[in-house]
């Protein structure tokens, strides 16, 4: 190791191109990788003396060749390689040195091959001098005494194919060599050029012994080279895998060396994976991987083993360890398949195909577990090679015929042809230049042609005018003179010379001629062309020169420059008309303006035109001067300002005049930011930002930034860098930088998006003051103010170095050399905790100032400071001291925004003046300019903006109450006049907003409260002498629960609500509450039926506070003077009002009435058979008065309400006691029902309460009885008193009703509950109103005409007065029929062919309908001509297969085979399939013309009927899917009476349809309630009708023997699948065992069901057995006797 001597293998690899050429000449193909593998790893194992570094010794080559060419056990894949080696040795190329041509490079141990018996030529002197030991630090250990070399090698070697002598040394020592040079006379072998860890140090001590080995470690240079020259194992495992595989066979590493290689070349994770895979590949005794731990540890130890490498066993174990380690390397190198990485490998524009293939195969090896050189992977590699090649090569390869037969070499060869035939860059440029010139010539020719046509038209028109005006006398056309020759194309008409025209003739005199299309005036430009007005505009980033054409209506482009829209325009030109397209919107940039415009695309136009449309949009002006026409337009930039609506008032604010005296600037020069620069708080430690637990770095890529924006924020970034606020860094955190354009200027400011950082930083409690009550601590006596605004406040606080990497962002400035990340050294803006951190730091710094200056009041809101003092002197002194303190602390104040020692200042959006706060005119102007909203979001924005001013608006909540419902997105937005009035009233109230006094915390407060329409309104006041000054106007809407309370309780809720808001202004001072109710008595003795204990406790904690006192109602309550909608309530006593408003009925009792019957109600709900069953019942103690089951899923509470409601209805006009064991129903009737009704049946969350409909029904039914008492009784009692017994019976009746199918009310004496007006005179007779309602319901289901509907009603058993007029009225008022029915016209009655019985004669037709569900577009209609029965089937297609399928699957099984089928000549009916089916079935298929009434009138009329019915149903239901409505249309068609008064149903089935039976679906009922109730009644009727037929099935069966078979019987067993001509039964079989349902027989393993058996017929036996008694008691004698008769 470390020498530079070349070896045969390295020589061939260095000159591989020559080697491959020689192989090509030999008609073989070789690969570089296999060449190296065979030479260094494979052939040295043959035992013929082949060294790993190769040799040109012919004897060794021939020995390897014999093994390779063996018939059995040979290596055909190695044949090309050994043949090339032989050719190189026999005909050496020039780069083979002379010594290598005859040298035998082999070790003494490796010369035992077939060539060992041949005398070798004496070695020549070495080319290089002998080298001493290369280890620089220490000498190698002393060698043992060298033994004399053997005199001669063995005479005879083993024959080819014969195994070498087992006594010969094997293992790693077989190929080791010494590093020291040997003398030329030494016959032991040539010197090796490779340093090995295990090296032979001499001949073996014994003739057949092992060569002693000595350990030499790897050099650091080799390890460094291997580490640096190979990619990492994770990136490319093939590199290190090949390296270690070669090292294992060439360098003889020991166990320690292997560990050293693993430690240096691999990472910890890679090393563990390799060792794990290696231990999985340890082979057992059977040659397969073993799982035994002892064998694994023995073959592949993880700890250093005690192996002796000078013994055969040690060398064998080392060899096994190396092989296992290589197997582990290969196993760990397997990667999951990632074909996406393979598809990313594309051929470069100038990349040769062979290089691209090599890269592609390398990608396969790296990203897939496949070997691309394997035969099975060639197809995939070939497809990838074709698909990922360059476009021209890919196009060529895809066109090859028989592509599947091409190998990779063939594809590369074809690709090389295309690659080498490519045109060069110069050729491509030349070709493109010629094509451009050709296009230019064609365009010029077209333009010349068009101009020629135009001039010809103009000249001809002028000539015609001349002929009409000046040549009237001579209208004949002039002919040329006789003999005058015609002129050539380039001949002059004046001098007859060629090469010029007459106007350019030099011999012609300069005579001024009249010019065509020009004016004759003095001083004109003559024949020179006028300057054309042209402008250059940037369209989609491309500058284009336009010709200004005011005569053109539209602007024109010659090329679309992008997508073309669908719009087209016909253009009339001189050569005719043509259609041209329009472009989509294109972006134009004109100066600082940007507009979008659509252009007309006319490729034939000579130049782009700027028409009147774009000139108007640009407001262009065209000026004509001596220099030529000039086009100008308004170039003022359009600015867009985006801001929040609540900040819009700042646009209307007048700029605060700078009233700073220059003396202030001179006295404190270090505090003003304009002079002193950026500040730095010198007493605040650096801020440390704490992360959340588990937070990991996040890196958000920088968003793309325009050049303009980058240039705009560059000065700011550079300024921060110069000030040290920004510093370069390298951080795993990164957040994007956003350039924000400042309104009104082109300046940008950098804003960092710190949202991801804010998510990962711990939250701290915000201590920033609330601006709502900040001014409450300002005494009204302080009327002199100073306002200071700190400049760059957050940047005054330093950021701890450990926290700075969190706020890194990416910034590139090539001009300044800044590329990478920057971060903040100060507290950044946009960080969520910055306001709190700065507010706390500034508050701590200013604490000494507050303590030393009690004469002034200092208010701080983050970086806004307010100094208030009672006098100017105090204010000035306090302001000076504050400025001095701020300068000392390191803060900076903005001189532009400072307001010093003034009586009127603006602070936090308020105007402070004379101890009061006012709304600024800017805020009022903002609200006044808001237009009426059109969306819920705009309503919320208006209420939010106006809500900021609600302290100045009396009763703001009342004014805004109509607008609150419009803020919800879930309801439709409808702006009505009521909303507009509320909108205007809020604006008007804002204009008259008064001044509010600042709260004086030294005085008590008075709160006047009033409640109107669910809104709490109040005024917070303080006394000033004899007057009360308002501090704030308060108003708030009550929650839905409190809104439903009585007036007195709503007043309590209003006081509690407003008192909480007033506490924000009073800061816990004493408050006196004045209202128009005796609130204190209500709060101290609250009612127990209106509010929960939690709510009452909350109210008591607020109102029964020692600082809250209640005063008697005042004569004049300022709160009641607020605008109200009704008069004030009269004077009352709250306790009486609450008692009156508690119940729903004053005489409702909760104790039984004496001498009154008692009913017991109960509801039951339970789960049976996985379903929740429910029922309700009423009993009177002896019998059931009413019982019914309820819909599935009904709760027990709902069932109780239903039972109680039904009892109240049945007791209408009576005196009754009703008992219920439900607390829910009892409380609803007595207490909660009234409360629910008052607050709109809403919960505290504003949602509908449960069982809303049942509660409303109960509240209405309570008033029906004459006198009623609803009593609560305990449930499930075991006593014998009447109440307990009645309750138990009611409970049992409810449970039975729940299990039954009865779902309708069942009354004992219904006649007692019917009013006299409702008593029917005859059974079945209806009142006119009920009759009309019945007809309407029937018409809604059928939509029949008046005649058919009248026939249908007459078939019922109902008697309806004025039936005909009612039918005509109902049908004439039907909107769906009016919109669908056609106008009837008189026609003569025709005749049609009909069948003589049902199912004989059918007519069939297709009709097209609009697309419906599942893609159905057609309707296949069959109609029986005899009965009129119709069948209709939705279909997707109109084909013969569909017709045949419906005939076979629908018509034949149900109606039989028809004799005649009639249809038109449609393709589906005349097809061979349809006619063939008719022939096979014997159907006479009659074809006729379409729409012929005599032949197909019945089916055509039915098509119309079905379509009309579907249309009516769709109009009524609003549904669009006609497929779902088709069954209802068929119901109408099948139950419509015909001309004989019979419906198709009656003709076909011989009876009326179920819907016409009395009491059916349409039958009237005393309680004619909703549709669901009617359908349930119909279900009961149907169940009653069919019960008699099916009840026999449900009777319990008789106890009988299930089958007659007994043990010992002979039975026959049925075959499951009898074959052709095979009996159905098999057997007989003997019965062995029986069960009630199955039988076990002899000969069949499985049990046989009794239904598959029958008794076998009796037969005469041919033999019998007899039992005879024997003498021995334990013996029996059985005798067989032949039956002679059976023979």
From Swiss-Prot:
SMART domains reported for this sequence: ZnF_C2HC (SM00343)
GO cellular component: host cell late endosome membrane; host cell plasma membrane; host multivesicular body; membrane; viral nucleocapsid
Notes on the domains: Gag polyprotein: Late-budding domains (L domains) are short sequence motifs essential for viral particle budding. They recruit proteins of the host ESCRT machinery (Endosomal Sorting Complex Required for Transport) or ESCRT-associated proteins. RNA-binding phosphoprotein p12 contains one L domain: a PPXY motif which potentially interacts with the WW domain 3 of NEDD4 E3 ubiquitin ligase. Matrix protein p15 contains one L domain: a PTAP/PSAP motif, which potentially interacts with the UEV domain of TSG101.
ZnF bounds (CCHC-type): 490-507
Gene3D superfamilies for the chain: 1.10.340.70, 2.30.30.850, 3.10.20.370, 3.30.70.270, Acid Proteases, Gamma-retroviral matrix domain, HIV Type 1 Reverse Transcriptase, subunit A, domain 1, Human Immunodeficiency Virus Type 1 Capsid Protein
UniProt source species: Woolly monkey sarcoma virus
Keyword NAD belongs to the record: no
Residue ranges of coiled coil: 408-455
Pro residues compositional bias, start-end: 139-157
Binding, Mg(2+) 3: 1405, 1464
Protein name: Gag-Pol polyprotein
Span of domain RNase H type-1: 1153-1299
Reaction(s) catalysed (UniProt annotation): DNA(n) + a 2'-deoxyribonucleoside 5'-triphosphate = DNA(n+1) + diphosphate; Endonucleolytic cleavage to 5'-phosphomonoester
Sequence motif PTAP/PSAP motif, location on chain: 108-111
Residues anchoring lipid (N-myristoyl glycine): 2
Motif stretch (PPXY motif): 140-143
CDD domains in UniProt: RNase_HI_RT_Bel (cd09273), RP_RTVL_H_like (cd06095), RT_ZFREV_like (cd03715)
Cofactor (UniProt): Mg(2+)
Biased composition (Basic and acidic residues): 420-451, 479-490
Residues under site feature: Cleavage: 128-129, 196-197, 455-456, 517-518, 641-642, 1310-1311
Annotated segments matching region Disordered: 106-197, 420-490
GO MF: aspartic-type endopeptidase activity; DNA binding; DNA-directed DNA polymerase activity; RNA binding; RNA-directed DNA polymerase activity; RNA-DNA hybrid ribonuclease activity; structural constituent of virion; zinc ion binding
Chain residues that bind Mg(2+) 2: 1180, 1200, 1221, 1291
Lineage, highest ranks first: Viruses, Riboviria, Pararnavirae, Artverviricota, Revtraviricetes
Name of encoding gene: pol
Similarity section: Belongs to the retroviral Pol polyprotein family.
A single BP term in Gene Ontology: DNA integration
């Amino acid at each position: 190791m470390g020498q530079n001597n070349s070896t045969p293998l390295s020589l061939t690899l260095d000159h591989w191109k020559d080697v491959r050429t020689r192989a090509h000449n030999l008609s073989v193909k070789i690969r570089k990788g296999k060449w190296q593998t065979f030479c260094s790893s494979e052939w040295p194992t043959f035992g013929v003396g082949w060294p790993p570094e190769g040799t040109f010794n012919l004897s060794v080559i021939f020995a390897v060749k014999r093994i390779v060419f063996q018939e059995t056990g040979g290596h055909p894949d190695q044949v090309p390689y050994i043949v090339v080696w032989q050719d190189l040795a026999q005909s050496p190329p020039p780069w083979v040195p002379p010594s290598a041509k005859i040298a035998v490079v082999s070790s003494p141990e490796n010369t035992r091959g077939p060539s060992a018996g041949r005398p070798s030529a004496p070695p020549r002197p070495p080319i290089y001098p002998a080298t001493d030991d290369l280890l620089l630090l220490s000498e190698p250990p002393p060698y043992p005494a060298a033994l004399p070399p053997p005199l001669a090698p063995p005479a005879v070697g083993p024959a080819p194919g014969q195994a070498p002598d087992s006594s010969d040394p094997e293992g790693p020592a077989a190929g080791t060599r010494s590093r020291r040079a040997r003398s030329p006379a030494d016959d032991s072998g040539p010197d090796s050029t490779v340093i090995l860890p295990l090296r032979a140090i001499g001949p073996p001590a014994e003739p057949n012994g092992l060569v002693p080995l000595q350990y030499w470690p790897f050099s650091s240079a080799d390890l460094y080279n291997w580490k640096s020259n190979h990619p990492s194992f994770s990136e490319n495992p093939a590199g290190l895998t090949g390296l270690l595989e070669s090292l294992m066979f060439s360098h003889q590493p020991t166990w320690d060396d292997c560990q050293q290689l693993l430690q240096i070349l691999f990472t910890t994770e890679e090393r563990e994976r390799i060792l794990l895979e290696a231990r999985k590949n340890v082979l057992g005794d059977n040659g397969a991987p073993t799982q035994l731990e002892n064998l694994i540890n023995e073959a592949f130890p993880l700890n250093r083993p005690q192996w002796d490498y000078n013994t055969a066993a040690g060398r064998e174990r080392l060899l096994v360890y190396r092989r296992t380690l290589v197997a582990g390397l290969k196993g760990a190198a397997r990667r999951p398949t990632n074909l996406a990485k393979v598809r990313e490998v594309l051929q470069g524009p100038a990349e040769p195909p062979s290089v691209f293939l090599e890269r592609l195969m390398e990608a396969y090896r790296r990203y897939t577990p496949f070997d691309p050189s394997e035969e099975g992977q060639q197809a995939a590699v070939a497809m990838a090679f074709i698909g990922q090649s360059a476009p021209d090569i890919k196009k060529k390869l895809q066109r090859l015929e028989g592509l599947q037969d091409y190998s990779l070499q063939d594809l590369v060869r074809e690709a090389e042809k295309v690659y080498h035939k490519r045109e060069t860059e110069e050729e491509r440029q030349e070709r493109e230049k010629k094509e451009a010139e050709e296009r230019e010539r064609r365009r010029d020719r077209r333009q010349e042609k068009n101009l020629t046509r135009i001039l010809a038209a103009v000249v001809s028109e002028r000539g015609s005018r001349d002929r009409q005006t000046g040549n009237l006398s001579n209208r004949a056309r002039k002919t040329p003179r006789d003999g005058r020759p015609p002129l050539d194309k380039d001949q002059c008409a004046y001098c007859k010379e060629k090469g010029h025209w007459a106007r350019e003739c030099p011999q012609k005199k300069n005579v001024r001629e009249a010019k065509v299309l020009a004016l004759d005036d003095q001083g004109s430009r003559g024949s020179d062309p006028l300057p054309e007005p042209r402008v250059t505009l940037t369209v989609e980033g491309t500058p284009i020169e336009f010709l200004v054409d005011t005569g053109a209506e539209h602007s024109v482009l010659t090329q679309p420059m992008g997508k073309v829209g669908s719009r087209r325009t016909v253009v009339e030109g001189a050569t005719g008309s043509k259609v041209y397209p329009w472009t989509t919107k294109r972006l134009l940039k004109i100066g600082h303006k940007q507009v979008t415009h659509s252009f007309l695309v006319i490729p034939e136009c000579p130049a782009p035109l700027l028409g009147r449309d774009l000139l108007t949009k640009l407001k262009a002006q065209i000026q004509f001067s001596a220099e030529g026409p000039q086009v100008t337009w308004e170039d003022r930039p359009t600015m867009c300002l985006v801001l929040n609506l609540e900040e819009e008032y700042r646009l209307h604010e007048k700029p605060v005049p700078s009233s700073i005296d220059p003396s202030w600037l001179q006295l404190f020069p270090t505090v003003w930011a304009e002079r002193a620069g950026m500040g730095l708080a010198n007493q605040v430690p650096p801020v440390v930002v704490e992360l959340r637990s588990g937070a990991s770095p996040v890196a958000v890529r920088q968003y793309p930034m325009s050049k303009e924006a980058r240039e705009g924020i560059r000065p700011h970034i550079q300024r921060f860098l110069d000030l040290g606020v920004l510093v370069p860094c390298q951080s795993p955190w990164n957040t994007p930088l956003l350039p924000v354009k400042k309104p009104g200027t082109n300046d940008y400011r950098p804003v960092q998006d710190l949202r991801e950082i804010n998510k990962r930083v711990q939250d701290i409690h915000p201590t920033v003051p609330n601006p709502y009550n900040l001014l409450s601590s300002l005494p009204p006596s302080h009327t002199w103010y100073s306002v200071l605004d700190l400049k760059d406040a957050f940047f005054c606080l330093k950021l701890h170095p450990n926290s700075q990497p969190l706020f890194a962002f990416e910034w590139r400035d090539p001009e300044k050399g800044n590329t990478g990340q920057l971060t903040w050294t100060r507290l950044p803006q946009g960080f969520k905790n910055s306001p709190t951190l700065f507010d706390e730091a500034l508050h701590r710094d200013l604490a000494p100032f507050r303590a030393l200056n009690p004469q002034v009041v200092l208010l701080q809101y983050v970086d806004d400071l307010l100094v208030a003092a009672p006098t100017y002197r105090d204010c000035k002194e306090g302001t000076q001291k504050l400025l001095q303190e701020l300068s000392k602390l390191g803060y900076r104040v903005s001189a532009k925004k400072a307001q010093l020692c003034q009586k009127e200042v603006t602070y936090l959006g308020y105007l402070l003046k004379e101890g009061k706060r006012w709304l600024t005119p800017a805020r009022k102007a903002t609200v006044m300019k808001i237009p009426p909203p059109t969306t819920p979001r705009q309503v919320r924005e208006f209420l939010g903006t106006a809500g900021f001013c609600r302290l100045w608006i009396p009763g703001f909540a009342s004014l805004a109450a109509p607008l609150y419902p419009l803020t919800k997105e879930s309801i439709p937005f409808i702006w009505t006049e009521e909303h507009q009035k509320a909108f205007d009233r809020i604006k008007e109230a804002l204009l008259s907003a008064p001044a509010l006094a600042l709260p004086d915390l030294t005085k008590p407060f008075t709160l006047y409260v009033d409640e109107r329409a669910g809104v709490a309104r109040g005024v917070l006041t303080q006394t000033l002498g004899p007057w009360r000054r308002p501090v704030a106007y308060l108003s708030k809407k009550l929650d839905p629960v409190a809104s439903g309370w009585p007036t007195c309780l709503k007043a309590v809720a209003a006081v509690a609500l407003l008192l909480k808001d007033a506490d924000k202004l009073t800061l816990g001072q004493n408050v006196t509450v004045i209202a128009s109710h005796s609130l204190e008595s209500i709060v101290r003795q609250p009612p127990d039926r209106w509010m929960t204990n939690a709510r009452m406790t909350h109210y008591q904690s607020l109102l029964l506070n020692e600082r809250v006192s209640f005063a008697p109602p005042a004569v004049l309550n300022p709160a009641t003077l607020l605008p109200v909608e009704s008069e004030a309530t009269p004077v009352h006593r709250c306790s009486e009002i609450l008692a009156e408003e508690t119940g729903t009925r004053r005489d409702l009792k909760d104790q039984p009435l004496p001498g009154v019957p008692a009913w017991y109600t109960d509801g039951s709900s339970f789960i049976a058979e996985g379903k929740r069953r429910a029922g309700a019942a009423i009993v009177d103690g002896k019998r059931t008065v009413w019982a019914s089951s309820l819909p599935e899923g009904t709760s027990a509470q709902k069932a109780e309400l239903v039972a109680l409601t039904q009892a109240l209805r049945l007791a209408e006009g009576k005196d009754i006691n009703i008992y219920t064991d439900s607390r829910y129903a009892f409380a609803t009737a007595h207490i909660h029902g009234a409360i629910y009704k008052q607050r709109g049946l809403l919960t505290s969350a504003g949602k509908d309460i449960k069982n809303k409909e049942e509660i409303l029904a109960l509240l209405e039914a309570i008033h029906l009885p004459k006198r009623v008492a609803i009593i609560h009784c305990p449930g499930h009692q075991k006593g014998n008193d009447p109440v307990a017994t009645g309750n138990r019976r009611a409970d049992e009746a409810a449970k039975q009703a729940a299990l039954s199918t009865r779902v309708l009310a069942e009354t004992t004496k219904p006649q007692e509950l019917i009013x006299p007006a409702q008593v029917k005179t005859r059974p079945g007779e209806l009142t006119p109103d009920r009759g009309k309602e019945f007809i309407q319901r029937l018409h809604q289901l059928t939509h029949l005409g008046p005649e058919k509907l009248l026939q249908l009603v007459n078939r019922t058993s109902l008697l309806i007065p004025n039936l005909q007029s009612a039918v005509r009225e109902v049908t004439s008022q039907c909107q769906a029929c009016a919109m669908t029915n056609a106008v009837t016209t008189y026609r003569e009655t025709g005749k049609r062919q009909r069948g003589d019985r049902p199912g004989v004669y059918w007519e069939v037709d297709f009709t097209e309908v609009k697309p419906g569900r599942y893609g159905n577009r057609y309707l296949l209609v069959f109609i029986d001509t005899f009965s009129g029965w119709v069948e209709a089937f939705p279909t997707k297609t109109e084909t013969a297969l569909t017709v045949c399928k419906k005939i076979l699957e629908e018509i034949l099984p149900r109606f039989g085979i028809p004799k005649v089928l009639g249809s038109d000549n449609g393709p589906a009916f005349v097809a061979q399939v349809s006619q063939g089916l008719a022939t096979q079935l014997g159907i006479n298929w009659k074809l006729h013309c379409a729409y012929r009434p005599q032949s197909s009138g019945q089916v055509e009329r039915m098509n119309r009927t079905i379509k009309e019915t579907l249309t009516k149903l769709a109009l009524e239901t609003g549904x669009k899917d006609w497929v779902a409505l088709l069954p209802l249309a068929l119901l109408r068609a099948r139950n419509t009476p015909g001309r004989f008064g019979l419906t198709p149903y009656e003709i076909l089935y011989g009876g009326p349809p179920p819907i016409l039976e009395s009491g059916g679906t349409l039958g009237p009922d005393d309680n004619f309630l909703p549709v669901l109730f009617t359908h349930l009644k119909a279900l009961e009727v149907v169940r009653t009708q069919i019960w008699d037929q099916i009840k026999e099935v449900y009777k319990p069966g008789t106890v009988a023997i299930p089958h007659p078979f007994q043990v010992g019987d002979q039975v026959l067993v049925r075959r499951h699948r009898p074959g052709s001509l095979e009996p159905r039964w098999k057997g007989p079989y003997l019965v062995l065992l029986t069960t009630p349902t199955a039988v076990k027989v002899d000969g069949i393993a499985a049990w046989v069901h009794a239904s598959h058996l029958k008794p076998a017929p009796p037969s005469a036996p041919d033999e019998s057995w007899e039992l005879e008694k024997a003498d021995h008691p334990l013996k029996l004698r059985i005798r067989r006797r032949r039956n002679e008769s059976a023979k």
